[in-house]
Amino acid sequence: MQIGPYSIAPKVILAPMAGVTDKPFRLLCKRLGAGLAVSEMTISDPRFWGTRKSLHRMDHAGEPDPISVQIAGTEPQQLAEAARYNVDHGAQLIDINMGCPAKKVCNAWAGSALMRDEELVARILTAVVQAVNVPVTLKIRTGWDCDHRNGPTIARIAQDCGIAALAVHGRTRDQHYTGSAEYATIAQIKAALQIPVVANGDIDSPQKAAQVLRETGADAVMIGRAAQGRPWIFGEVAHFLATGEVLPPPSLAFVRDTLLGHLEALHAFYGQPQGVRIARKHLGWYAKDHPQSADFRAVVNRAETPDAQLALTRDYFDALIAGVPPALSDAA
């Protein structure tokens, strides 16, 4: 898949997720097979650009090309200025968020709430595309609710405004993440456009990725929640799409080493105590399908230092590898 001058391969992309797709996670997913990793949503209001959170979100030093930064907001010129600011700070792709269903975003008329105002969508897209000399992409949902499934209309507006690629989540804003994603609307959008279309929603296995590509004709798939605690899914999907072969599940030793490396990267990136706190949700995701995961989470979530968090994690997985019960009560 081509987005401007950038060839995106393999055709499996990490979705932007607030509080998840930070620099350590993006680097990990790219290393394990993602063809593109989109940053967390950054707010377009310049009053917040100097906050600790925003500075972390805007840190892309050392990331492989292309660097894709997602922006969110409601005011066309403010979004245009945010796009310029991020390009000046290293962004090579600008992604506009019109897909987030969160109430705190939609109540401010950002994210997927923008899909209710097609004229405003056109003004935002035009302003951002004209503001920067890098490709601009867009993420949307299939519509606002089941009675207003206007994704195809928004998609045509996007193409007409110069958007370089479009990602579509197969739910309406009203669904949030309930029910199941549907792909017929994505197929309809793909059939009507000349720009690349990326399918998103409920893609949680290599087989599902292949199925969605067949059903939609999309140029790539985008994976979000299924990568939480499972960043190797990108390599699994890429391998299956290339060969038709399902890779065996990763070994416990591989999971352990991947997680320990991820923890160390979080500790280094955020410092103490923030790194330990942010790592806790990732620990829960990595452990959730393993024996005594609830007990492990209860113990490791009480760790207050990087060394303690790493030691408890290493001991837990070492016990699983050895086939013995983890000594969680002793660790507590």
Curated annotation (Swiss-Prot):
Role according to the record: Catalyzes the synthesis of 5,6-dihydrouridine (D), a modified base found in the D-loop of most tRNAs, via the reduction of the C5-C6 double bond in target uridines.
The entry's keywords: Flavoprotein, FMN, NADP, Oxidoreductase, RNA-binding, tRNA processing, tRNA-binding
Catalytic activity: a 5,6-dihydrouridine in tRNA + NAD(+) = a uridine in tRNA + NADH + H(+); a 5,6-dihydrouridine in tRNA + NADP(+) = a uridine in tRNA + NADPH + H(+)
Cofactor(s) the record lists: FMN
Pfam families listed in its UniProt record: Dus (PF01207)
Active site as annotated: C100
Matching InterPro entries: Aldolase_TIM (IPR013785), DUS-like_FMN-bd (IPR035587), DUS_fam (IPR001269), DusB (IPR032887), DusB-like (IPR004652), tRNA-dHydroUridine_Synthase_C (IPR024036), tRNA_hU_synthase_CS (IPR018517)
Protein name: tRNA-dihydrouridine synthase B
Species, as recorded: Xanthomonas axonopodis pv. citri (strain 306)
